[in-house]
Each structure stands twice: as structure tokens, then as C-alpha cells.
């Protein structure tokens, strides 16, 4: 279920770098190994899941991204309407896959934020090191 609240409704411009939040897109995490899982997914999504590492398949409405040999991310190619809180596809897959113990369907839409970043120094920003681990001198 989508409980999306945007962090910002505006573009932020700082020293020629523009950051804007992109409207959310539905994201479902799929896990399964059984042949019936693949048959059911293919029937419901009208597409085949990629089976090679670091590949994806695309249809008119959906993109399937390979995450591991038994895990995929399904992303809608359309932005989510903010006035709805249900996904028909999520419910269909949950009923056909999870309830029948063929695999797992997890809605991870609220877990990720997508940002559009543009400006003349973008490559310099992304080439900078970012330390995320605490330093021993910080008392850890």
C-alpha cells in the first residue's frame, strides 16, 4: 500500500545543481524458484523475467530487473497516482503467488526515493568519496 508523502514539492537549486524528487513508481520485489512461479508471473505480467545476471526485460507498462537467481524487482513505467492507495497487480500477484506458496511478493514502493539531479558539475559530485562508516576517532 502506498503511503507516499513527498519530501519536497519543489526543485532545489544550489550553485548550479538542481535536485528534484521524481514522482514515485510502483516497485514490487518478487522471489521464487518453482516452474509454476515463472509460469504464473509470465501470465500475469505478460512478460518473461530475466534469467541472466544484471539484465532486465521491458514491456509497455512494466520493467523487470534481475537482482539474484531467484529475485527480481518489478517497476511500473508509469508514475503512481497520488489519489490511489491500491495496486491491482500487487493484489493479483499476492493471491496467485504468495497465497499459493509459489514465491513471495513484497511491495517496496515506499522504501525508495528517486531524485533527478542535473547541473554542469554532476560528474564531479558523483566522483567524490563519501565516507559512511564511523571513524575510530569518532569513538566507535
List PLM regions with ranges:
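Acidic, proline/glycine-enriched N-terminal capping motif
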Residues: 1-59
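Short glycine-/aliphatic-rich beta-strand segments at the starts of folded cytosolic domains
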Residues: 19-34, 108-126
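Short helix/loop capping segments that flank catalytic or ligand/cofactor-binding pockets
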Residues: 38-39, 84, 125-126
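A glycine-rich, hydrophobic loop/mini-helix early in the fold
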Residues: 42-75, 82-97
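Helix N-cap motif at beta-to-alpha junctions
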Residues: 77-82, 120-122
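A short secondary-structure junction signal
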Residues: 92, 125-128
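Conserved short beta-strand edge segments in small beta-sheet-based binding/regulatory domains
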Residues: 100-109
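Single conserved hydrophobic/aromatic residue that forms the stacking wall/gate
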Residues: 131-140
Amino acid at each position: 500500500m502506498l503511503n507516499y508523502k513527498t519530501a519536497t514539492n519543489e526543485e532545489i537549486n544550489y550553485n548550479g545543481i538542481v535536485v528534484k524528487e521524481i514522482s514515485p513508481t510502483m516497485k514490487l520485489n518478487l522471489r521464487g524458484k518453482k516452474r509454476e512461479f515463472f509460469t504464473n508471473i509470465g501470465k500475469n505480467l505478460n512478460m518473461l523475467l530475466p534469467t541472466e545476471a544484471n539484465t532486465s526485460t521491458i514491456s509497455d507498462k512494466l520493467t523487470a530487473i534481475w537482482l539474484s537467481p531467484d529475485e527480481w524487482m518489478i517497476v511500473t513505467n508509469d508514475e503512481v497516482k497520488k489519489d490511489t492507495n491500491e495496486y491491482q497487480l500487487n493484489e493479483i500477484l499476492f493471491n496467485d503467488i504468495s497465497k499459493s506458496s509459489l514465491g513471495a511478493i513484497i511491495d517496496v514502493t515506499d522504501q525508495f526515493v528517486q531524485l533527478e539531479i542535473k547541473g554542469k558539475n554532476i560528474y564531479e559530485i558523483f566522483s567524490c568519496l563519501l565516507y559512511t562508516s564511523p571513524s575510530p576517532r569518532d569513538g566507535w
